[in-house]
Amino acid sequence: MAELATIARPYAEALFRVAEGGDIAAWSTLVQELAQVAHLPEVLSVASSPKVTRKQVAELLLVAVKSPLAAGAEAKNFVQMLVDNHRIALLPEIAEQFEALKNEREGAADAEIVSAFPLEGAELDSLVSGLERKFKRKLKPTVEVDSSLIGGVRVTVGDEVLDTSVRARLASMQAALTA
């Protein structure tokens, strides 16, 4: 996985430099759409077929996305470069790194919140507000439910984890008692 990140990083950084000259959010949408299309087994199969030219593969990828940026020269050149270098499979990792660069520029971060129970509305807003104060940045939350936590939440922001779940507390107590 780290190897894919290393290979994808220069592509994500180059695309981000291009995006800085325009609408970063629109470029983010484009690269997310390209990543979704490139992740499809059918597309990967067509891309590796010797009967299909590289130009046709690039056109297939661009036609499959809805973003109006796909018609632009920069997007066409980017996709063609990925196809020529056999890097289509890297698009999901490129999209992830592009999003990280975008978040860094905005002073934001993705927050993965795992809760024992569904979080919605004011409860979620209150939690996110508190987490933003703790992490000192704007958070973009995604919420998952995992009943095995018993209660509480586990929050992951970048490489930081805040685990206030009952399961984590029980594990901590067990470790203290058996030590």
Swiss-Prot record:
Gene Ontology molecular function, alphabetical: proton-transporting ATP synthase activity, rotational mechanism
Amino-acid biosynthesis among keywords: no
One CC-aspect GO term: plasma membrane
Residue ranges of coiled coil: none
Localization annotation: Cell inner membrane
Predominant location: membrane
Keyword Transport: yes
Membrane topology qualifier: Peripheral membrane protein
Keywords on record: ATP synthesis, Cell inner membrane, Cell membrane, CF(1), Hydrogen ion transport, Ion transport, Membrane, Transport
Pfam family, one: OSCP
Job description of the protein: F(1)F(0) ATP synthase produces ATP from ADP in the presence of a proton or sodium gradient. F-type ATPases consist of two structural domains, F(1) containing the extramembraneous catalytic core and F(0) containing the membrane proton channel, linked together by a central stalk and a peripheral stalk. During catalysis, ATP synthesis in the catalytic domain of F(1) is coupled via a rotary mechanism of the central stalk subunits to proton translocation.
Subunit structure, as described in the record: F-type ATPases have 2 components, F(1) - the catalytic core - and F(0) - the membrane proton channel. F(1) has five subunits: alpha(3), beta(3), gamma(1), delta(1), epsilon(1). F(0) has three main subunits: a(1), b(2) and c(10-14). The alpha and beta chains form an alternating ring which encloses part of the gamma chain. F(1) is attached to F(0) by a central stalk formed by the gamma and epsilon chains, while a peripheral stalk is formed by the delta and b chains.
Family to which this protein belongs: Belongs to the ATPase delta chain family.
PANTHER family: ATP SYNTHASE DELTA CHAIN (PTHR11910)
Protein name: ATP synthase subunit delta
Naturally occurring in which organism (per UniProt): Burkholderia vietnamiensis (strain G4 / LMG 22486)
Top-level taxonomy: Bacteria, Pseudomonadati, Pseudomonadota, Betaproteobacteria, Burkholderiales
Gene name linked to the record: atpH
